[in-house]
Amino acid sequence: KQDDPAWAPIFEAYRPITAWLAAKRPDVLLFIHNDHVTSFFFDHYSAFTLGIGAEYAVADEGGGARALPPVRGHPALSAHLGAALMADEFDLSFFQHRPLDHGCFSPLSMMMPHDPWPAAIVPLQVGVLQFPIPTARRCYRLGQALRRAIESYPEDIGVAIVATGGLSHQVHGERAGFNNPAWDAQFLDLIESDPERLANMTHADYATRG
């Protein structure tokens, strides 16, 4: 779809990210994402779920798994992050032997080559599909705790943090197809210049804006 005018801007936007990762060559990508009821279901749905596996396969989301190889995990870093975050009062769930869906593999496949993948990943699944869900403030504090945890890891490795997902979008309901480009641009500015303002917003604030 790279030559399709409707899709081309997406691929174009990934090129600086691809170039940055190729230059920095991180050992591990900490992949913050949400599962789309592919491997995590509402009968046991956690706010924050950390992957601790040695490998993650591509999930079959109904039409067969994409032709991508599994990606390596980093169990040692996962164990350290899990212990550090629990000590920092984040009560996590943990998983292994569960495939990852397009929330991980779609951006990953556009950010780097896959034969083989040049970096391992540590996936962190955020449960945002079923209320109650974490507040923006809670997610901001988790990000701060993740930085402390990564910086305290004793091995000298490069870690890049990837946060996936769309900005404003509505995939079902009365506003299906809605997006808000002006809010998207403002959000991207604020996440760098004034994250406290974003952290103070409510779920209703975010839902209204998209």
Question: Language model features by range: what are they?
Answer:
Residues H169-G173:
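Secretory-pathway/luminal and periplasmic proteins that interact with or process carbohydrate-rich
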Residues Q144-V159:
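Non-transmembrane, aqueous-exposed alpha-helical and coiled segments at domain scale
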Residues D35-V37, L167-S168:
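Catalytic metal-binding/acid-base residues of hydrolase active sites
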Residues D27-H33, L124, I157-G165:
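Beta-strand elements within well-structured catalytic alpha/beta cores of enzymes
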Residues K1-D27, S39-R141, S152, E174-G210:
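Flexible, D/E/H-enriched segments
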